[in-house]
Amino acid sequence: GLDKNTIVVFTSDHGYHMGEHGHWQKQTLFNNATKVPLIINVPGKDYISKISNSPVELIDIFPTLMDLTNIISPSHVVGESLKPIIENKSSDVRKSALTRWRNGYSIRTERFRLTKWDINGDFQYELYDHKFDEEELNNLALDSSYSLIRDSLIKTINRRIIQADMKPEGIGRQIENVLQM
């Protein structure tokens, strides 16, 4: 039947606040709003205890499906295939996951979250260590004992923002041409 040759993907587009951090709904960059379930079931794979904490992004789903079905992804695809994680849960395909909401960006590694807010050109940061603070209640951005981690993550988030804002070759020009008419 279909269960023998169908890949099933289950996810959600965002988490939801129920009063945490004084917020309701999804409109933040805290873990409550950005961490979503992602379950990929591939026929013939053994999934007992196959839980990975590797950071991934939803843009990784398409290249993963292409890779699992042995189809070459188009060159403009920016996600990463999660096939290495599916085959070995201790694998990583990326070191951080990037999220954007309004005037803020956030990256999540296995241990840390750094959020960068642009307040009229003035950058402000939040840094959380999930080893000691899973609820993201203690902002460590100004804690000198975390300065090396913070500075490293600031470089990473700036690089990831530039990469995320780049348009792939040949994509988007059709829309820009229509808007100029």
What are these regions (language model features)?
Residues S12, K26, G121-Q124, L142:
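A general marker of short, structured functional hotspots
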Residues G1-L2, S90-S91, S145:
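Residue-level recognition of short, well-ordered coil/turn positions
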Residues Q25, K45-V56, L68-S73, E136-Y146:
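Active-site rim elements
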Residues L2-K50, E57:
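Histidine-centered active-site microenvironments of extracellular/periplasmic hydrolases
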Residues H14-E20, I59-F62, M66-H130, E135, ...:
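C-terminal cap/loop subdomain of S1 sulfatases and analogous C-terminal strand-loop tails that border
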